[in-house]
Amino acid sequence: MKRTTASSSYCVHAGMLIENIKIWLVVKPLQFFYGRKRLDDKLDAMRNLPENSIGYDLAIMLDLHNLRLIPGFRNHDLNHLVLGYGMEWDDELCMQAYQVGNGYREWQCFVFLSSAIIVPTLWPMLWAHFQMGRASVSINELDFETCMMEQTVVVRERFRQCKTNSLKAGLAYAG
């Protein structure tokens, strides 16, 4: 039992480290340096879009996490909303694995995903999400600007469809 507790404690500490790296080395500097006013105005406009639209739901999601829009990361936040991944460190790692499997080749994915090396207990789950990404419709065509007025459920359904049954195989592997 002690081993499980030690493993859980390690995982919690590793998760806190990963979360702090994400917040203090990526999110906060980008929020500070990029045009706050213009993007804050955009976020305000999104809050006034129809309920259940991508734009409205994305604004609410960012508000709940005390985040703002960041240039270059708008599609990233959109992926959280559409794919249903949370914003905690383990969900973030799973989404990065999914995106790499789905053909996303942005440097941020690889940098953040590389932090998983300190949490080997997550590797089977990350592999499963990588496999789900490979089996799913490409999210590379999902665009922040063009889908703001679309209903969130419709967009989620469109991008969560799998090309094959390998999604079930990936989930079975994750246990």
What are these regions (language model features)?
Residues F144-G175:
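Elongated scaffolding segments in large macromolecular assemblies
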